[in-house]
Amino acid sequence: MNSPDPAALRASRRKLLLIMLVFAAPIVAAMLLTFAGWQPSGKANGLAVMPQRNFAAEQVPVSLTNGDTWAWRAKEPQLTLIALAGPGCAKQCMDVLTKMAAARLTLNQNAPRLRLLYVGKPPADAAATGMTNYWKLGQDSMGALAPFAPTTPDSVNALLVESDGTALSFYPAGFDPTGLRKDLQKVIR
């Protein structure tokens, strides 16, 4: 029987170690970066809601115009996009609300996975403009959503809420509806 060549044996071991290193290096690098506290920056257009809020756990009641109370946890997994209007929702406010509803439509077959909720005093011409075709209208009787409402007249803030009632992203007045649409397309697939 032939004895293995020591040089060939060392070369085989080096190749095996090199292959193991190729697969282990990214894992080790990720662990080092995580322990150092580095996290990749996201490209979301909305702001993170800090401290995290769960409206279902807090039992935030939103009274709908038909007398029902908004169910934060839907029967099927559905996110909720809440529009919170400032005082005197008029032309600019309605324009943003229309763009938000259009962002839902761009989700195509995933559009039913997003619910639209308008909280606050509805515009005077809400029914005439067809707003009620897309938005559920409600009131925050306890003022639990007041910290998210704008104070600027004729403006809208938006809040994206997960299907379990956890507030995910906040979009302050003057936000870009196109950025909101992009975020929705990332989250709802």
Regions found by a protein language model. Name each.
Residues 76-78, 111-113, 153:
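Extracytoplasmic
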Residues 154, 160-189:
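Thiol-/selenol-based redox modules, centered on thioredoxin-like
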Residues 1-10:
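N-terminal Lys/Arg-rich, disordered targeting/topogenic segments
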Residues 114-163:
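Short, internal strand/loop/helix patches
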Residues 91-131:
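Structural microenvironment flanking redox-active thiols in thiol-disulfide oxidoreductases
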Residues 25-28, 38-73, 95:
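N-terminal "domain-start" segment that seeds a small globular fold
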